[in-house]
Amino acid sequence: MANYTAADIKALRERTGAGMMDVKKALDEADGDAEKAIEIIRVKGLKGATKREGRSAAEGLVAATVENGVGVMIELNCETDFVAKADKFIALGDVVLRAAVASGATDVDGLLASDYEGRTLGDYVTEEGALLGEKVAVRRLARVEGAFVDAYLHKTSKDLPAQVGVLLAVDADSADAKTAAHDIAVHTAAYSPTYLTREDVPAETVENERRIADETARAEGKPEQALPKIVEGRLTGFFKEIVLVDQPFAKDPKQTVGKVASDAGTNVTGFARFRVGN
């Protein structure tokens, strides 16, 4: 006769995030001892971790916070949206984010090597992934600093945690600047710019786009004397797609993002944008 109850199974599932059959097997093996059962679940889960390493983890969440003028954002991945919306996975995202803030890490390797309750954060994430039964990985980390930093998180589904996150810094902290920063952060989430300014775009990327614009215009039979103006016009269109400050502002497309910032007495000085799986 089993030395545990249905309530014990429910409690252990809530503590570990493991499936019902895995919990029952662990309790059977542990003769009803909950702590021993947790250890069994961890061991069996970790044994399967190497098998999970090669699996794709393209679901998950983005978490972000701002403290003392420093914005920190992480992307935590798992394999399925079922785990992505689990309370235990969401709590793990908060642990990783808090560890990123506390450690001051600037990249994922440094974050995973940081200490967390007597072991590395990387080991803790692996252990939690074992309990969840999926490959769980910290994919990205961003830190953005400025006079004011806005953090914006966007849910693409009401059933899932945030899938898109933005950190956006400006060089002023007035009320107008803060409002503009938030509006531009929301814009950034929707329009996914790649670079802050034209100067940030690699020269080879610009030259390649210039060459394509020139060759395309020639193939269209445009007159030779009109080519320079046509090429520059197409380059401007290219910059409007990928450069944040050159993009038409979402709330008022007649203005650029850069103009919105300057009208608020500030400038955008940095940003980071994550979308789960991208």
Curated annotation (Swiss-Prot):
Annotated region (Involved in Mg(2+) ion dislocation from EF-Tu), positions in chain: 80-83
Record keywords, A-Z: Cytoplasm, Elongation factor, Protein biosynthesis
Gene this chain is encoded by: tsf
InterPro entries linked: EF-Ts_dimer_sf, Transl_elong_EFTs/EF1B, Transl_elong_EFTs/EF1B_dimer, Transl_elong_Ts_CS, UBA-like_sf
Protein's name according to its UniProt entry: Elongation factor Ts
Gene3D superfamilies attached to this UniProt entry: 1.10.286.20, DNA helicase RuvA subunit, C-terminal domain, Elongation factor Ts, dimerisation domain
Source superkingdom: Bacteria
SUPFAM superfamilies xrefs: Elongation factor Ts (EF-Ts), dimerisation domain (SSF54713), UBA-like (SSF46934)
Organism the protein comes from: Micrococcus luteus (strain ATCC 4698 / DSM 20030 / JCM 1464 / CCM 169 / CCUG 5858 / IAM 1056 / NBRC 3333 / NCIMB 9278 / NCTC 2665 / VKM Ac-2230) (Micrococcus lysodeikticus)
Family assignment from sequence similarity: Belongs to the EF-Ts family.
